[in-house]
């Protein structure tokens, strides 16, 4: 697609500035050259049109890389309606380029909470009525939840949902356990080519990029505390170590904690003896009083709480690369401390009380992206080559679920298919192979003797389902 002028009469969109479309198109063309797996799938399945008839409701960060995803879905036959899953993550030139191509999109950087909810609604509605959608592509679960709570009738036609993130998968599993989930779901997050690339290697690239763009600080020689050591935490700790920071890690899972130790990070707790009893007395003030930067990476709630924020070193930087802004107790900060905007998505939080503040006061924290995703709020997120794996998985997951035609099954068959599953390993390997080829790499092929010896086929899959990469 190369259009940069909105089709005549097309008004089914809302973006910050449609005149940014040409800029967005130029960046999208560059991104395509850095997304070999996604573009490989576009070429491979173009003639087959596996998504012909698919009507996809999409809610994922409206970035340049997402523009390539959207246009791949459309090229393979789908119709889509789109919004962003985060109020700060939209790249306005990307949204404009999609609108200019005649694709409904409702997203702009710096939405209010009310505008965010409105954009979600517009994704679902066409001409004021629920669109006859039959697929969902989500990031974080807000769109899926809204459909279940407010538009359940739409779900009668939906074949499934593909979910991008850890947080969204947790919400899906919770809904499934409670008997609330009405459609099957593919857990894209736990595909190896998503979790290792996006969560780990992506954060390794984009965390330090965002912090430096937001603060213009030198990071080397300073102390950082990374909260959580899952894949996002691992990538984040590596990102800060690459900058020369002295990195400490806190964890609740003994296995992840062991990995942090084995990777050479000091494992600490912000709480004395690791016990948070909810009081200031339980805080390790000696530890937090030396921390220059704290990063939350967990997808859990209140992992950087009010008492921790009180104990942090003056002028410490606070940010989140998990998912929602409830990882950091921003509600406490809004209620009790004064906020001074330095520039968009960068605030000085004066710990001298609410209301007025002295601009020369030095007892403040620097909060990035208001506690939301720092890499998308203060920078442009993961690079195209990283998102290539994630979005190739999304395309394959959409094709996989669309072909299953869940909505057309009998009630008995639906009950059997109502699950939250990862993509088959063979498809994960398909994405990985395309990515390797994009790097110019050559994968060695097993001989028949070797394949027989380890009990696999020459074409794969090559590892058992439970293998941990």
UniProtKB/Swiss-Prot annotation:
The record's gene field reads ahcY
Part of which pathway? Amino-acid biosynthesis; L-homocysteine biosynthesis; L-homocysteine from S-adenosyl-L-homocysteine: step 1/1
List localization entries: Cytoplasm
Q: Which Pfam families match?
A: AdoHcyase, AdoHcyase_NAD
A GO BP entry: S-adenosylmethionine cycle
Q: Which family does it belong to?
A: Belongs to the adenosylhomocysteinase family.
Matching entries from NCBIfam families are given as:
ahcY (TIGR00936), PRK05476.2-3 (NF004005)
Needs which cofactor? NAD(+)
One CC-aspect GO term: cytosol
The record's cofactor note says: Binds 1 NAD(+) per subunit.
Task: Write out the residues that bind substrate.
Answer: 63, 139, 164, 194, 198
Q: Where does NAD(+) bind?
A: 165-167, 199, 228-233, 251, 300, 321-323, 375
Q: What class of enzyme is it?
A: hydrolase
Keywords tagged on the record: Cytoplasm, Hydrolase, NAD, One-carbon metabolism
Per the record, what are the reactions this protein catalyses?
S-adenosyl-L-homocysteine + H2O = L-homocysteine + adenosine
Q: Which organism is it from?
A: Pseudomonas putida (strain W619)
Q: What EC number(s) would the UniProt record show?
A: 3.13.2.1
- Physiological role: May play a key role in the regulation of the intracellular concentration of adenosylhomocysteine.
One MF term in the entry's GO annotations: adenosylhomocysteinase activity
What is the designated name of this protein?
Answer: Adenosylhomocysteinase
């Amino acid at each position: 697609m190369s259009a940069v002028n909105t089709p005549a009469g097309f008004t089914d969109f809302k973006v910050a500035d449609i005149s940014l479309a040409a800029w967005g198109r130029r960046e999208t063309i560059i991104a395509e050259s850095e997304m070999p797996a996604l573009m490989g799938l576009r070429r491979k399945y173009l003639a087959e049109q596996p998504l012909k008839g698919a009507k996809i409701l999409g809610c994922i960060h409206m970035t340049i890389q997402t523009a390539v995803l959207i246009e791949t879905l459309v090229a393979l036959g789908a119709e889509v309606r789109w919004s962003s899953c985060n109020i700060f993550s939209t790249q306005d030139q990307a949204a404009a380029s999609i609108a200019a191509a005649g694709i409904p999109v409702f997203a702009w950087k710096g939405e209010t909470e009310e505008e965010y909810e409105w954009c979600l609604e517009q994704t679902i509605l066409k001409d004021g009525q629920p669109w006859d959608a039959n697929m969902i592509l989500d990031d974080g679960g807000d769109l899926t939840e809204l459909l279940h709570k407010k538009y359940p009738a739409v779900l009668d036609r939906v074949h499934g949902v593909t979910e991008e993130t850890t947080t969204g998968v947790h919400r899906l599993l919770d809904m499934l356990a409670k008997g609330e989930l009405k459609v099957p779901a593919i857990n894209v997050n736990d595909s190896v080519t998503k979790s290792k690339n996006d969560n780990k290697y992506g954060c390794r690239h984009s965390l330090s990029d965002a912090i430096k763009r937001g603060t213009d600080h030198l990071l080397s020689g300073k102390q950082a505390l990374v909260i959580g050591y899952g894949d996002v935490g691992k990538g984040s700790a590596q990102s800060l170590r690459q900058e020369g920071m002295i990195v400490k890690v806190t964890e609740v899972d003994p296995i992840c904690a062991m990995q942090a130790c084995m990777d050479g990070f000091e494992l600490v707790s912000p709480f004395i003896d690791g016990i948070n009893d909810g009081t200031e007395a339980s805080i390790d003030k000696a530890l937090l009083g030396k921390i220059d930067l704290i990063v939350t990476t967990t997808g859990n709630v209140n992992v950087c709480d009010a008492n921790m924020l009180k104990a942090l070193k003056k002028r410490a930087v606070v940010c989140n690369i998990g998912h929602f802004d409830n990882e950091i107790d921003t509600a406490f900060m809004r209620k009790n401390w004064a906020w001074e905007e330095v520039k968009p998505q960068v605030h000085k939080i004066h710990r001298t009380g609410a209301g007025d503040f002295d601009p020369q006061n030095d007892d403040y924290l620097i909060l990035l992206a208001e506690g939301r995703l720092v890499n998308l709020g203060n920078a442009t997120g993961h690079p195209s080559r990283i998102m290539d794996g994630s979005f190739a998985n999304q395309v394959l997951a959409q094709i996989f679920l669309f072909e299953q035609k869940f909505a057309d099954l009998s009630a008995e068959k639906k009950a059997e298919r109502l699950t939250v599953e990862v993509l088959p390993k063979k498809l994960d390997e398909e994405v990985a192979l395309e990515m390797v080829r994009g790097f110019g790499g050559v994968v060695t092929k097993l001989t028949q003797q070797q394949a027989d010896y380890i009990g696999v086929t020459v074409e794969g899959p090559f590892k058992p389902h439970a293998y941990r990469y």
